[in-house]
């Protein structure tokens, strides 16, 4: 699933190319996860503002002249990607949405069809407010601190990895990045979340930021389907310390990396470097 790094890489690849463009048409293919919530023809002639990201969502504000006209909230689902080109090839069976502008076309490709694009009157109202209202803090912003994490973990008996994946304390730290950050912080993913001390929370905050920044520099991770706005795959998975390295030597100590299942998701960790 595209997580924060993949979504941010996508946004960065689009922001200067599509910002300021004028919508000509919105073409819909097979129904996606949610109805779009607006008649596509109503978007024609509207201008696209500066793209923003919240968690794993991309917000595309629209203007009708000088008047705000809501915006489109894009979600890549389990396997989606957005690509923008002046001239795209003919759509294939997994291409479900195409936003045609005076600069080119933006296409949502999603083999598993869990992705979505929905119209909302603003980020603070309508479906955007419902989808984003329960999200935690952004991990790369100043609001994500050890004290915020420590407070959010209080009373949580679930494993720390599952607490991070929930997204209501901190957003966008997906499965691969949870495994990697817990390794960097030296924390066993099975440890009860409520048992993390403030000092270990500080290490974990720094580890999450380190791993996410490395992933951004690498263009995200492409385990199967993800491509950025230029059609290129990410490379972070090639430098992973533990993720998808079961029964291989830990790059730090040489012990064999273990694989377990937590909440139906694969977890990878070093039994020597990561302590409870």
UniProtKB/Swiss-Prot annotation:
Q: Which CDD domains match?
A: EcFpg-like_N (cd08966)
PROSITE patterns per UniProt: FPG_CAT (PS51068), ZF_FPG_1 (PS01242), ZF_FPG_2 (PS51066)
Active site at which residues?
Answer: 2 (schiff-base intermediate with dna), 3 (proton donor), 56 (proton donor), 265 (proton donor)
Q: What is its EC number?
A: 3.2.2.23, 4.2.99.18
A GO MF label: damaged DNA binding
Against InterPro entries, the record matches this protein to:
DNA_glyclase/AP_lyase_DNA-bd, DNA_glyclase_Znf_dom_DNA_BS, Formamido-pyr_DNA_Glyclase, FPG_cat, MutM-like_N-ter, Ribosomal_uS13-like_H2TH, Znf_DNA_glyclase/AP_lyase, Znf_FPG/IleRS
Q: Which residues participate in DNA binding?
A: 94, 112, 156
Coiled-coil intervals: none
SMART domains, per the entry: Fapy_DNA_glyco, H2TH
The annotation note on the cofactor reads:
Binds 1 zinc ion per subunit.
GO BP terms: base-excision repair
**Known function:** Involved in base excision repair of DNA damaged by oxidation or by mutagenic agents. Acts as a DNA glycosylase that recognizes and removes damaged bases. Has a preference for oxidized purines, such as 7,8-dihydro-8-oxoguanine (8-oxoG). Has AP (apurinic/apyrimidinic) lyase activity and introduces nicks in the DNA strand. Cleaves the DNA backbone by beta-delta elimination to generate a single-strand break at the site of the removed base with both 3'- and 5'-phosphates.
Which family does the entry's similarity section mention?
Belongs to the FPG family.
Subunit-structure text = Monomer.
Spell out the protein name for this chain: Formamidopyrimidine-DNA glycosylase
- What is the protein's species of origin? Leptothrix cholodnii (strain ATCC 51168 / LMG 8142 / SP-6) (Leptothrix discophora (strain SP-6))
